[in-house]
């Protein structure tokens, strides 16, 4: 009898967990606040963002402050510059904003400096080096910009908050920024030199634009530092692979194949799993980080898999899926214990940036 009572108490505790996620819908100028509980995900609120009701301003990147009190949103479609907007998680109301660069995209806040680091993707501009904007989120002031590569994306901070990492999609490089010194500390070419030996001269010539600038075959779109080891993992969107980089040696330590068009990557907080969206196939892949074995590929609810947010207890992955045409976006919930899709909810069109907010015990 005692065992039965304990079982029921534990079961009730597990079932009473609730998880909250924010997701941006780029073609609708909305952000949805979602709640996942008892294996069901629901939309609690749909927040209209942007200033001009007749224009699509393109909410792209979204992140929650480490203290959970604020969320930040990049509006990519500016005239010409985009901007960063700060919101309260308590009320989902605007608290401030600042202008950034061309097509501001992904971002994170450092737990050490308190600054927010946002890459300016420059999607529609000429293929030349762009920047990382460094913002004081208290005053919402852009402190400085740091020049990196062409079409930088995937801005992520090291677990200790001392370094910011991003990849340049068109120049095929990994950049490490000193979060305290506010300058590029190291740059790594991600191209596979072994492949280059076998490609034709015509293919190599095609890697350069008319102005002589390199066009990457790897086309990296995301980087995520390992939470416990000095490693980072990069999505090779053009080369259909994940690239592992040893941050101590500052060199590529491994490559493994994926489906077509890996886009975003995240690592579970317990450091056991690597999750990747396979954008061109509308799938989500799960790998064991211990041996890099593919554990499961899961078909998403609709097409164009995009972003990933993982719960703080490493039990669930929340996947934003853009959809095509006039379809609504979708957020899929995947169990990281049995590798199955367990719930989905419709949000605004072209669901993209996604961020985990909090977990609560009811």
Regions flagged by a language model, labelled:
Residues 3-13:
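Sec-dependent N-terminal signal peptides
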């Amino acid at each position: 009898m005692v065992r039965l009572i304990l079982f029921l108490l534990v079961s009730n505790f597990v079932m009473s967990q609730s998880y909250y996620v924010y997701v941006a819908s780029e073609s609708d100028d909305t952000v949805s606040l979602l709640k996942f509980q008892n294996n069901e995900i629901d939309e609690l609120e749909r927040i209209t963002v942007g200033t001009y009701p007749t224009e699509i301003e393109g909410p792209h990147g979204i992140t929650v402050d480490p203290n959970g009190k604020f969320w930040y949103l990049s509006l990519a479609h500016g005239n010409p510059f985009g901007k960063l907007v700060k919101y309260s998680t308590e009320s989902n109301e605007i608290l401030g904003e600042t202008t950034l660069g061309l097509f501001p995209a992904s971002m994170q806040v450092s737990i050490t400096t308190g600054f927010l680091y946002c890459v300016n993707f420059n999607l529609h501009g000429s293929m030349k080096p762009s920047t990382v904007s460094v913002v004081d989120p208290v005053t919402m002031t852009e402190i400085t910009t740091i020049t990196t590569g062409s079409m930088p994306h995937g801005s992520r901070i090291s677990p200790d908050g001392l370094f910011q990492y991003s990849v340049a999609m068109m120049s095929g490089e990994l950049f490490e920024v000193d979060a305290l010194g506010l300058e590029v500390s190291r740059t790594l070419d991600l191209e596979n030199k072994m492949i280059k030996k076998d490609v034709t001269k015509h293919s190599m010539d095609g890697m350069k634009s008319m102005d002589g600038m390199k066009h990457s075959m790897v086309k990296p779109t995301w980087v995520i530092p390992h939470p416990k080891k000095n490693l980072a993992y990069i999505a090779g969107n053009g080369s259909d692979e994940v690239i592992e980089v040893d941050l101590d040696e500052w060199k590529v330590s491994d490559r493994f194949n994926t489906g077509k068009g890996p886009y975003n990557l995240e690592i579970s907080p317990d450091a056991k799993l690597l999750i990747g969206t396979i954008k061109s196939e509308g799938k989500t892949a799960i790998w064991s980080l211990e041996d890099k074995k593919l554990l499961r590929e899961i078909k998403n609810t609709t097409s164009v898999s995009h972003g990933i947010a993982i719960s703080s207890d490493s039990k669930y992955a929340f996947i934003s899926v853009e959809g095509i045409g006039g379809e609504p976006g979708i957020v899929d919930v995947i169990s990281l214990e049995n590798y199955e899709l367990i719930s989905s909810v419709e949000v605004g069109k072209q669901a993209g940036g996604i961020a985990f907010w909090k977990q609560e015990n009811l």
